[in-house]
Regions:
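GST-like domain detector, emphasizing the conserved glutathione-binding G-site
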Residues: 1-129
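Conserved alpha-helical elements of sugar-nucleotide-dependent glycosyltransferases
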Residues: 9-13, 200, 212, 216
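Alpha-helix C-caps/helix-loop-beta hinges
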Residues: 48, 75, 175-176, 192, ...
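Non-transmembrane alpha-helical segments in soluble domains
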Residues: 66, 70, 88-91, 95, ...
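GST-like fold's C-terminal all-alpha helical module
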Residues: 96-212
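C-terminal active-site "lid" helix and adjoining low-complexity regulatory extension at the edge
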Residues: 213-226
Length: 226
């Protein structure tokens, strides 16, 4: 079982890997304001994604989870590398820079923050009243407290930030089809997951304007089997 929030970038990281490996699993969408109760079996982790094996064993934290799933169901092939230093460096880069860029692109402006929270309220599992409360009360928090601070600290517009990051990512891939070479590896799927998490929102069009980034993105997407 994979416990998720539909709009959580960390959940999308794991979902892409599972779809690529064609692993059958049940997907459980958690109520966004009841995660502590619904994930009580995690002994205090209380964050998505959570992977639970049939024997009840629980895996948490998206990147270690991806490595463990690859190890158990794919003999660790997607984490194997001839250049482990490069692999580790760029997995850390993806988890640091792409993670921090997701909130600014979705909530970096007042209007975009409102559009995002309304969209989230429709995609996530909320109760009748909590859905409406989140849609209209959530965006000032996400925009005013979190996103504006990150945008101000970075100094770039969210679109420019993403295009700069995609330039850096694609430059590292170079002439290869994927970061992993001729086939995607776990670093590819981690980066793909962060970008894919933006796809349900209108702001994704700003990323689609980056030609090289979208060429790579579509290549990874084409490897998904589920």
């Amino acid at each position: 079982e994979l416990f998720i929030l539909h709009t959580c970038p960390f959940s999308w990281k794991v979902r892409g890997l599972l779809e690529h490996l064609d692993i059958e699993y049940d997907e459980v969408q958690v109520n966004a304001i009841r995660t502590k109760k619904e994930l009580a079996f995690t002994n205090g982790w209380n964050k998505v994604p959570v992977w639970r094996e049939k024997n009840g064993e629980v895996l948490v934290d998206s990147t270690p989870m991806m490595k463990e799933i690859d190890s158990r169901y794919n003999d660790g092939k997607l984490w194997q590398s001839e250049d482990e230093q490069r692999r580790d460096k760029w997995m850390e880069w993806v988890d640091e820079h792409l993670k921090r860029a997701t909130i600014p692109i979705l909530y970096g402006g007042l209007f975009s923050a409102l559009k995002t929270t309304v969209r989230v309220s429709k995609l996530e599992k909320f109760g009748f009243f909590s859905k409406r409360l989140y849609a209209w009360a959530g965006f000032p928090i996400m925009w005013g407290i979190i996103a504006r601070r990150r945008v101000k600290k970075d100094g770039r517009k969210p679109k420019q930030l993403w295009h700069d990051l995609l330039d850096e990512w694609c430059d590292e891939i170079g002439e290869a089809e994927f970061f992993g070479g001729g086939a995607p590896n776990l670093v590819d799927f981690a980066a793909f997951g962060y970008i894919r998490s933006i796809s349900p929102f209108s702001q994704f069009s700003q990323l689609q304007e980056h030609e090289r980034g979208m060429t790579w993105y579509k290549r990874v997407k084409a490897t998904l089997k589920a």
